[in-house]
Amino acid sequence: MGGYEDIEGFHYGQEITFAADGRPALGYVSHTWWADEPRDGREPGSPLATETGFWRVQPGEDGGSVVEVTLAHPFGIAEIYVGTVTGTRVDLDHNVLIRTATARDVTRSVRLYGIVEGGDLAYAIDMEAEGKPLQSHLSARLHRVTD
């Protein structure tokens, strides 16, 4: 489910791919598409967003793990998140956010990922943008599909 203070709630579909190639980071690609009735010029299946990047897990000072996530978006934003891994939960907060002159005025994003009952991946993304306070923006529960 998606939405924001100035965006009517909407449903979307998503595919996330994590890929390992032997280096100390997982490649990451996410594609989302409109999954609601036609609205605001959007039709079911029309693309919404893509993000691509890498996830690196490093040993933490307290025996836990630190995760560093770099993401790039085609709408003019690049992000670096730093967070912690606790069991099957990953908490991420912005470390750096870079915007082009024409990108939306996003100033902060916080993400929570976790493996939930049945082995699904659930997440929530909160966003601070356009002068509005940090608030819920996206959340989903994804089922694992293997080739």
UniProtKB/Swiss-Prot annotation:
Family classification? Belongs to the nitrobindin family.
Q: Which cofactor does it need?
A: heme b
**CDD domains, alphabetized:** lipocalin_heme-bd-THAP4-like
Q: What keywords would UniProt list here?
A: Heme, Iron, Isomerase, Metal-binding
**Keyword Iron part of the UniProt annotation:** yes
Top EC category? isomerase
Name of the protein in its database record: Peroxynitrite isomerase
Give binding positions for heme b: 137
Q: Which InterPro entries match?
A: Calycin, Nitrobindin, THAP4-like_heme-bd
* Species assigned in the record: Frankia alni (strain DSM 45986 / CECT 9034 / ACN14a)
